[in-house]
A protein has these predicted regions:
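Alpha-helix N-cap and loop-to-helix initiation/capping positions
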Residues: 13, 17, 40, 70, ...
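Alpha-helix-loop-beta-strand connector modules within alpha/beta enzyme cores
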Residues: 42-65, 93-118, 152-181, 211-224
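Conserved anion-binding
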Residues: 56, 64, 68-151
Length: 224
């Protein structure tokens, strides 16, 4: 089984009126829901977080800001909102300091991450070594791996190498758009994966209905 995180996001931005979207899928059987630090106000994100917590879900915020200052502001906002997980970011030591005293599980990006939407660069061995170094830090729980955002790497080989190197769970995020990709990530040992854009575009079985697609993905992930 692999964990599915439904992201209330499209093109690396939180969708408009995310709380309204969440209310439409709250009965699908999800365990995890997430959003990005770009595209919605802190108040909107807090509303989603509070509703999801009331429904028994864990909440993830993924940081995709491209500047260090914006990244750290987003991590601070995540702590203020009260999310359970903070994903992404490229300055783990600074992120650890910002999250000091928070209960959020911190999972930064391994490797070299550039641009928005985010792209992962580097050789597999380099990314795996980055994974080892980052998860050795006190205050890092796991990793947010942009497995399908690497322009050339074999996704299965990349994910397997990072999973082996990591001292914590690996969540594969970005551009997951098919059940075949989910199976690849599961076989490679990823703890979980995120899907947002592909569902909002109706590209999964059950589409275009968002709730039907979520149920299909949950079944493929072994959570139905």
């Amino acid at each position: 089984m692999i964990e599915f995180v439904f992201m209330l996001t499209h093109h690396d931005r939180t969708v408009d009126r995310p709380a309204d979207v969440y209310r439409g899928i709250r009965d699908c059987g999800l365990r995890y829901v997430g959003f990005k630090d770009i595209g919605a106000s802190v108040a909107d994100l807090r509303e989603v977080c509070d509703q999801a917590h009331a429904d028994g879900l864990e909440v993830m915020l993924e940081v995709v800001s491209t500047s260090k200052a914006d990244e750290l502001r987003s991590i601070a906002a995540a702590a203020e909102i009260g999310v359970d997980w903070v994903l992404g970011g490229t300055h783990p030591r600074d992120g650890i300091a910002v999250l000091a005293g928070s209960k959020a599980r911190y999972c930064p990006f391994p490797g070299t991450v550039v641009d928005h939407p985010s792209v992962l660069l580097g050789e597999i061995a380099e990314i795996a070594e980055s994974a080892r170094e980052i998860t050795a830090l006190d205050g890092v729980y796991g990793l947010d791996l942009l497995a399908y955002r690497h322009p050339t790497a074999d996704v299965a080989a990349l994910t397997s190498a990072v999973v082996r190197a990591s001292a914590g769970p690996v969540i594969a995020a970005g551009s997951v758009a098919s059940l075949e990709q989910v199976a690849t990530l599961d076989a490679a040992g990823a703890w979980g994966f995120t899907i947002g854009s592909a569902i909002f575009e109706g590209r999964l079985p059950g589409g275009p209905a968002i709730d039907a697609q979520i149920r299909q993905v949950l079944a493929a992930a072994g959570q139905a």
